Amino acid sequence: MKALGVLPVALLMVACSASEPTIEPSGQATFSSPSVAPTPTGASSATPGPSATPTPKPIKTPKPHPISVQALINKRYDGRDLKVRRLVADYGAYKRYIITYRGDGLTISGVMNVPDGKGPFPVLVLNHGYIDPDTYFPGQGMPREHDYLARHGYVVLHTDYRGHASSDNDPNADYELRLPYAVDTINAVKAVKSSKLPYLDKNRVGWLGRSMGGGVTLTALVAQPGLVDAAVIYASVSSLAADNWKQFYRPSEDRSKTNRRIARTYGLPDKSPEFWRAASARPYLDRVTEPLLVHHGTRDDTCPIRWSEATVKTLKTAGKDVTFVKYRGEGHTFDRQWRRSIERTTAFFDKHLN
């Protein structure tokens, strides 16, 4: 398997026997009046006025590290100008278009599948997993989900992220632990909601993310709670940045110059735990307000299932609406039980977006 970088995820196909997956539900101070000394006869009497109350000095909130989830929480998002650029395919049940939108000073590209019919249709913004930007093409990743969901009445908008396909480049995206990808998907939703395209239902929007895109989705959920109506993640990376670094860091990679810069600037997780925790979604999962469906295979050796188990446990402890489905024997990309998983996904979105 190809080495994957800081937070990357490669696809690994494992054929597995189908089985019924496991689903988990989801002291008081006293003040005395001042005494006044007796006034001699004939002397004028003056009534003491109230003493001035000192104005408290405002407490300054420490500015978060720019590479942190808190910085994303504080950020203002300006996704807009969703434009359909050209038709690339007509599959009968739906048409596929190249699109762009603006946000964070960048133009981001993507593809959008639009079902035939009058609409308006609910919208799903898809967040793809790690693919080398040098070989990535528009809309790459999750082709089965693209097709199935469009055929079942959903507009599917796949964001390419910055630095991918025709999107504007951001040379610091890797150095910033790919947290800017969450900015791109948040701005994709903002662009949908501000669009005048008549077939988009701005009041019914969800997120779906796979692998690295699962982590992008979790980060977006905590950065902008309430922006979408529901979310689904498949085979997600960990909600702790340190886990992902330890799993995917490969010093011998061509991209290791960035990795060395990260280690030199921020420190390794064991030496700088505060930085790595601040760059993680998990400490902020109590901010999630949307129903969440989590799919994970028990034989995933790219993103171990224990990562989703820990994420789900944290969400449940916070009282969140999360459903966890484990697929016995499935690997990272899903094989025999993919159909079952996408049917659950569609039913989940049908429930929460309709």
Where are the language model's segments positioned?
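C-terminal motif of bacterial Sec signal peptides marking the signal peptidase cleavage site
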Residues: 13-15
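Alpha/beta-hydrolase active-site loop
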Residues: 175-196
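Hydrolase active-site cap/lid region
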Residues: 218-269
